[in-house]
């Protein structure tokens, strides 16, 4: 009887020491069903699944929802005195991307890498060339920590605002009625700085969201603005079977109730043959008015919502967790107490890299899942335009060939100008496949600030959290090795390093036996005491002590086993 690979791989004795990588190709799910891993996470250790609502459970349709927000913000600006001509602008989804930085001094939209190096710079609709950029940023670099000047437009809600800033700067720079200045524009004796304009836009956006008609118009036509996924009840019900599920949203109860009712307004329950269930039944805890990111710090008073009126009941809620109660405010500490969970027991799923992901990880140690809707298009370009990526690799090979037989004694200077021009052209074509500002994650070979934040703070990420449906709850999401250039560009072949070729070859940490006392005495110039230290040398670990992956650590399992043994005694 033959044994399948699946059976053999579950028996430590049958595991092969090594294998030809072509003999057993690693299984990967379809790209659009994948969950991508920055830090290893064992799903069986997760006891609570937490969700944000806006752009997570409720995905707003693009560009319809951004267009609505854009139009309402423009109307608000015109109502406070901005020119009527602005009403002619229409939201263009091909221009903005998330993660751009607005320079409130010069009015520029800037795409930067993790260190503040400028990748793309646009003044209005004008994409600035290198010389133009260097006139305002001599080193093509910005100080990102200067938050008074530089504002990061990181969220999906920022997309209409990003495009509106470009529209305004372009309008006031090119309209004949206004005189353009380096830091703003003039209308006769009136001067408006880009900083003041930016603050007006920020105030208008806040007004539209909190006092205006954005939510009202969204609710009036939910099919137009909100994506409904029939798989949502199924995933939440499966999560209910293995742990607790909670909702934490900054939205108020009335809006939350209308959105969630629409999402679960299906003719069936979790399965096609099951009866319909109200949305509240899928959650062990529902919390509105969270005021994230404040929620992950000191928080606010925990109140109870009267679900009949939507108003808050007086007094602070001090009771235990009760199914069906809707809470308002509170903090992540209070939530953990109600759920009986600690930091790493919780997987929190959200779209806001600062309000949801960064703060929940840094302040509470929650495991994090970032929803990135743009990832669907990024993957499409990555696969559909593979010929462009392959051409860039070929150009790298051509470049290496030109320098192949040259060293520091060579006077020959190969003409690489044609290859450089081609690299720039292919890179530009590749960037334009994503949109005018290029990819959300990179510009050419360099990763963006947004990409670095995703890698730093999100344990998992995907285009949609629904992709968790395609993984068992016992799954180990194991992070791939992050290779440095000396690892990714050097093949796994034995290389002999001779001391004559490289004096650095003597810096070998494993070949010499430093435990030889004679070797040590030979190098000592001071006298040796007859009284010896308890340990002359460190001992090589005989067991696995180095924590390579966050969820590879077996200490927690050992502690749980010890606790179970104590309880049995």
Curated annotation (Swiss-Prot):
Localisation: Cytoplasm, Cytosol
Q: Which residues bind IMP?
A: 52, 54, 202, 206, 215, 249-251, 292
- State one molecular function term (GO): GMP 5'-nucleotidase activity
Region Disordered, annotated ranges: 530-569
Q: Which SUPFAM superfamilies match?
A: HAD-like (SSF56784)
Any Pfam family matching the protein = 5_nucleotid
Region entry Required for tetramer assembly: which residue ranges?
Answer: 548-569
Q: Which UniProt keywords apply?
A: Allosteric enzyme, ATP-binding, Cytoplasm, Hydrolase, Magnesium, Metal-binding, Nucleotide metabolism, Nucleotide-binding, Transferase
Q: Which GO terms describe its cellular component?
A: cytosol
Cofactor note (record): Binds 1 Mg(2+) ion per subunit.
The biased composition feature labelled Acidic residues covers: 550-569
Q: How is its activity regulated?
A: Allosterically activated by various compounds including ATP, 2,3-BPG/2,3-Bisphosphoglyceric acid and Ap4A/P1,P4-bis(5'-adenosyl) tetraphosphate. Binding of an allosteric activator is a prerequisiste to magnesium and substrate binding. Inhibited by inorganic phosphate.
| Annotated Basic and acidic residues bias | 540-549
Question: GO biological process annotations for this chain's record?
Answer: adenosine metabolic process; dGMP metabolic process; GMP metabolic process; IMP metabolic process
What does the record give as EC number?
3.1.3.5, 3.1.3.99, 2.7.1.77
Q: Which cofactor does it need?
A: Mg(2+)
Where's the active site on this chain?
Answer: 52, 54
- In its keyword annotation, does this UniProt entry include ATP-binding? yes
Under NCBIfam families, the record lists: HAD-IG-Ncltidse
Q: Give the quaternary structure.
A: Homotetramer.
Recorded family membership: Belongs to the 5'(3')-deoxyribonucleotidase family.
Described function: Broad specificity cytosolic 5'-nucleotidase that catalyzes the dephosphorylation of 6-hydroxypurine nucleoside 5'-monophosphates. In addition, possesses a phosphotransferase activity by which it can transfer a phosphate from a donor nucleoside monophosphate to an acceptor nucleoside, preferably inosine, deoxyinosine and guanosine. Has the highest activities for IMP and GMP followed by dIMP, dGMP and XMP. Could also catalyze the transfer of phosphates from pyrimidine monophosphates but with lower efficiency.
Name this protein carries in UniProt = Cytosolic purine 5'-nucleotidase
Underlying gene: nt5c2
